[in-house]
Amino acid sequence: MAVAQTPVAPSTPAMAMACTSGALAAKTGVVAATRFDSRGKARVSPPAGTSRLRGPTRSSRKSSRLVAIATAASTAASEAKPASKGEQMRAEEFRALANEGHNMIPLYRRIFDDQLTPILAYRCLVKEDEREAPSFLLESVVGGTQTGRFSFLGSRPYMEVVAKEGKVTVLDHLRGTREKTDESDPITVAGRISERWTPCKPKGLPECFAGGWVGYMGYDTVRYQYLNKLPFEEAPEDDRALPDLCLGLYRDVVVFDHATKQVFAVHWCDVDAAPGGDAEAALAEGEACLGALVEALQPETVPSLPFGEVSMSLTAPPSALTDSTMTKDAFLSAVAETKEHILAGDIFQLVLSHRFARSTYADPFEVYRALRVVNPSPYMIYLQARGSILVASSPEILCRTDKARTVVNRPLAGTRARGKTEAEDVALEADLLADEKEKAEHTMLVDLGRNDVGRVSKAGTVKVEKLMEVERYSHVMHISSTVTGSLLDHLGPWDVLRAALPAGTVSGAPKVRAMQIIDELERTRRGPYGGGVGYVGFMGEMDMALALRTMVVPTAHDDNIYKLSNDAEKRARREWTIHVQSGAGIVADSDPESEYQETVNKAAALARAIDLAEEAFDV
């Protein structure tokens, strides 16, 4: 395997790193105190000689009452001041963890969430003109009405892995290097990098993701497993040249716990990356990085976020999407060809899709804000990745593993619109469960899910925990089933992800043969659509959403170390092209006209978010 290593400029000086020793003190597994100023705003003052992110400090703030939200508080100390007992205990604990072999150790602070929202926190970390800076915001709405307990966000990954047709680029922003390799299976690259670390389970943090890899794996990622059967050379036209895989390693993450009304700012210390692998040096750098993260969340000038007025009817028909990669006649013809393959016994089912395009001057982040209103879903995603921005409201999990090493697959198939009343919902649920076509399609997908889970699970542990239950979402209801298994001892989350891609709900059955036919029928590559987007945490937890109901906004080049700019032109409004891809599951008795209309309706639901963004933000 040929490797070329080229030195490049570090990422941003602020993050590479605005982390000098002597910055804010933090505590391993124990949170720090927070000061509130006269306006009631949470503040953490940096020590003398440092600033929020760089350069000399401002004059010290007036002291106000100190509110401790933990049993122990830490105070900033200058080098000339003797270490306090609490600081000595923290250093000893950190050193003990390092001596036990842990080389990835988390520090964190927690603050009240009453003056901070996930949207505002994201804008504090990522400025309006930094649309190409890799970053993410993950939120959740359960049952269409209940906010999920956690929201996650982060920016400035320390490392990125980007793959395109076997060419893998590893960008190390901390060291300022770029390594290019040829890989037969790029999914293994992030896994191999992760093997360097023995992470320490954070004390006091909620049981959730708090740092690790975040990004997407596109539909075409599966080709690496079946290069002979699904070669890139026979794939549809690659008109956007987006990466097959794009992952960022985030050691600085902000976690909102909506149940306890707290925000956790987390930094993971890489002990081995410290000079000489020294634990004390790693702790000092970690304290500085954590301090910079906390300070970034409470800037002197709060970012301006237009309120956005919701004056349009959210149930009104959205603007029509007419620009597609397939005309209606072409789609109907492709459905007919698919049914011929089914009757010939080649396949049982195939998911046929096409891609719509919509131009708008609404900023992608404004579209995400509108999407949260229009279509709240279990997986609300705003992801700035290499070459594109993903704006998603996916209802469906691709795969999940937890710290107990349980593998979860939850196919969704079979859909009805929500009723206006509870009685209508109940009647629609009964109608959905009585639909033989919907049940047959769902049964095939459950079988595919059992097979995917079985490939990575211990014998005898694969179970269908729930079968054909109706789940309600904000605008629709779906038939859902849940398949679980116990992960084999020698496998990890990356193996689970490899086995799950792509989901049967976006490919068909049998999976590989269906994908071969999709290559023949569809006009362009799917890109992120039909793949997975989510996270793999340091502790092995993984949650990947299926990239459905996902808007893809092409941005720029995908192969450069990101650069941030204050150029006024980048702050001005520009025209964006938003891609919305949707598909329909074709079976033997499918009606071509109905299947086409299903794809149009699915895409239109996302177009409503663009309509709202344009109206609410006066675009």
Set out the residue ranges of the language-model regions.
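Intrinsically disordered, low-complexity regulatory regions enriched in Ser/Pro/Gly/Thr
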Residues: 1, 7-9, 22, 62, ...
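N-terminal mitochondrial targeting presequences
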Residues: 2-5, 17-19, 61, 65-83
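Intrinsically disordered, low-complexity polyampholyte segments enriched for Lys and acidic residues
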Residues: 27, 37, 41, 62, ...
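N-terminal chloroplast transit peptides
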Residues: 1-53
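Extended alpha-helical targeting/anchoring segments
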Residues: 74-619
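Intrinsic-disorder/low-complexity peptide segments enriched for small residues
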Residues: 13-15, 22, 51, 64-67, ...
